[in-house]
């Protein structure tokens, strides 16, 4: 029975590693937007799944690992990585609940980090039992990465044409699309099955090196071996490297360039004259790249924005050094502190250590920084190790460098794969076997702790998923995804019924109220819409979008003074947003007035 349990648990873990990049690569930590749940088997096959299902999978795997596999030691291979990413980081996220004004953000960060912790601990538990499961899991991950590369190619060749056709059909049907949304849809940057083009680029930085080596090894199964390995290597390069450039992520390209440079200059066998020549060439290449960036597109705006994020995070650390400002508070505080002219409103500092430090306290930020450094501790050691180990560790290094300027920590697939690669490529299990077996008390306490954590994560994830499902039902009623449903909208009574379901499962959440309020405004029911927005403001007071909505209602009702007061409140909360300027706002009001008979 125990052997059967081990096999089932191991193969379930392997399946999850295959599914990670394919189904669990979308963006988490965004309670404003509900997850998309598949309606049937066909939809389940073609779309990504709600990322919070990873908590259910992690809880089941952790519980099964504790029941069927022997308890590993923290000094076992990968134990330090598992300690930081599986246990310390989830615990470090808890102080962020203390000052959090937004209940949704507090909940979603707990769900996110405890779910990832359970999955990472289960992977460490299984990996510690032997090399076999490491090998299977890494190969399954490589197969999943290959599929994301294929999907990236499909998007680049056909996907954007489909988007253009969709916009054309919606316009013909009379459905209004905002200019900002249209620009985002038509921006031909590949994101495959991950949340965005930048996070997809970061994921490729992480997985291309190890996946290339593993896919090349697949060629050994076919004769002639040398020709097969050459073909498999070419296939891996063709399917994985071009999508990295199709993302048009300049930060990812820079990280790949810098990581490659560090690798080159740390090779002791390369003559010094070659290193000096490459250093000069690299400086010239970066200077030329800087000129090119400055003269094209957004220029250095993205870079200056990220520096401004870090500035705001540093100020927040001085305001609440021990417990942080609370999860979700960076969004509100940064809008007041930002010094750039853009209207971007980031939810995170785009740096995991800064995110933990400013929202959960400086000690939490130190733990996150330690967790990142733990992944690099083997980078310059064991130069005699296999090509797979060296490739995987340099991929982790490039990914961590990219994570210092991107929201990779919000992507479950990226975080889990980063920790799992480090654990799987740790020294073999022989070192653990040579040490004495853990005592019975240690085994029992480890099993009990793992089962307790698995139960807690399962309940927490299931609770959040129920709320997500209710929120999605409300969104589908308000914003149908097919043209036929858009011409047969749900009745107001049905909308309010779905809203009550959301409130029961996500109490004190402002987002369902705002979504329903927008619907009521579009139908001309301004008084009830105003009531919903006022309730939303009572839950989270620092949202400029709510004040702007209330200003719109006041303007449509002829209360110009009230509209100006709400607009002033929105401008105080987000001074850089041009939508909060009176000139722009009242121009938009004039467009809206034609839709209502007041």
Regions found by a protein language model. Give the residues of each.
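Membrane-interfacial, low-structure loops and terminal tails that flank and connect transmembrane helices
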Residues: 1-2, 71-78, 219-229, 431-443
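A juxtamembrane structural motif centered on a specific transmembrane helix
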Residues: 2, 384-385, 421-465
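Alpha-helical transmembrane segments of multi-pass inner-membrane proteins
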Residues: 7-24, 52-69, 85-99, 108-125, ...
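Juxtamembrane membrane-water interface segments that cap and precede transmembrane helices
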Residues: 29-47, 99, 177-194, 304, ...
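Short extracytoplasmic/periplasmic juxtamembrane "stem" segments immediately C-terminal to an N-terminal membrane anchor
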Residues: 41, 172-176, 306-317, 472-495
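TM-adjacent membrane-interface loops and short helices in multi-pass inner/ER membrane proteins
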Residues: 160, 164, 196, 307-346, ...
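Hydrophobic alpha-helical transmembrane segments in integral membrane proteins
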Residues: 291-307, 442-482
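C-terminal luminal/periplasmic domains and tails of membrane-associated envelope-modifying transferases
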Residues: 475-598
């Amino acid at each position: 029975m125990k052997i059967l349990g081990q096999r089932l648990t191991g193969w379930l873990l392997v399946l999850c590693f295959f599914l990670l990049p394919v189904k669990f690569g979308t963006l988490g930590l965004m309670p404003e937007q509900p997850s998309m749940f598949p309606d049937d088997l066909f939809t389940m096959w073609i779309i990504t799944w709600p990322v919070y299902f990873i908590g259910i999978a992690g809880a089941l795997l952790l519980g099964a690992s504790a029941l069927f596999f022997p308890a590993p030691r923290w000094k076992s291979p990968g134990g330090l990585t598992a300690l930081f990413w599986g246990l310390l980081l989830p615990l470090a996220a808890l102080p962020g609940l203390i000052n959090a004004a937004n209940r949704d953000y507090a909940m979603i960060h707990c769900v996110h980090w405890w779910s990832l912790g359970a999955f990472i601990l289960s992977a460490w538990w299984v990996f510690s039992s032997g090399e076999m499961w490491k090998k299977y899991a890494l190969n399954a991950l490589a197969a999943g990465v290959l599929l994301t590369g294929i999907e990236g190619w499909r998007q680049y060749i056909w996907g954007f044409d489909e988007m253009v056709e969709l916009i054309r059909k919606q316009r013909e049907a009379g459905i209004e699309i905002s200019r900002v949304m249209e620009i985002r849809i038509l921006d031909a940057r590949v994101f495959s099955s991950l949340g965005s083009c930048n996070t997809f680029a970061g994921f490729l930085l992480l997985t291309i090196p190890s996946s290339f080596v593993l896919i090349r090894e697949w060629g050994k199964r076919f004769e002639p071996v040398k020709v097969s390995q050459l073909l498999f290597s070419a296939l891996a390069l063709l399917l994985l490297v071009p999508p990295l450039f199709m993302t048009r992520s300049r930060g990812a390209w820079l990280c790949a360039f810098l990581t490659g440079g560090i690798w080159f200059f740390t090779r002791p066998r390369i003559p010094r004259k070659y290193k000096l020549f490459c250093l000069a060439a690299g400086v010239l290449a970066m200077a030329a790249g800087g000129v090119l960036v400055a003269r094209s597109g957004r220029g250095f705006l993205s870079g200056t924005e990220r520096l401004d994020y870090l500035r705001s995070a540093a100020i927040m650390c001085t305001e609440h050094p021990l417990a942080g400002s609370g999860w979700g508070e960076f969004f509100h505080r940064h809008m007041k502190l930002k010094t750039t002219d853009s209207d971007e409103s980031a939810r995170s500092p785009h740096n995991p250590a800064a995110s933990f430090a400013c929202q959960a306290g400086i000690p939490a930020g130190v733990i996150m920084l330690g967790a990142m450094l733990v992944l690099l501790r083997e980078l310059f050691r064991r130069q005699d190790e296999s090509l797979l180990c060296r490739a995987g560790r340099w991929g982790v290094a490039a990914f961590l460098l990219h994570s210092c300027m991107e929201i990779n920590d919000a992507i479950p697939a990226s975080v889990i794969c980063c920790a799992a690669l480090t654990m799987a490529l740790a020294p073999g299990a022989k070192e653990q076997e040579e040490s004495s077996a853990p005592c019975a008390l240690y085994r029992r306490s480890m099993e009990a702790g793992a089962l307790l954590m698995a139960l807690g994560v399962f309940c927490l994830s299931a609770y959040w998923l129920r709320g997500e499902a209710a929120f999605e039902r409300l969104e589908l009623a308000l914003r149908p995804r097919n043209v036929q449903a858009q011409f047969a909208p749900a009745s107001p009574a049905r909308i309010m019924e779905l809203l009550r379901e959301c409130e029961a499962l996500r109490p004190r959440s402002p987002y369902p109220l705002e979504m329903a309020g927008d619907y009521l405004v579009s139908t001309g029911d301004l008084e009830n819409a105003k009531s919903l927005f006022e309730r939303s403001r009572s839950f989270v007071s620092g949202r400029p979008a709510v004040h702007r909505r209330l200003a719109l209602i006041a303007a449509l009702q002829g209360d110009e003074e009230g509209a100006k007061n709400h607009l002033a409140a929105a401008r105080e909360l987000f001074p850089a947003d041009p939508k909060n300027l009176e000139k722009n706002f009242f121009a938009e009001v004039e467009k809206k007035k034609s839709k209502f008979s007041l």
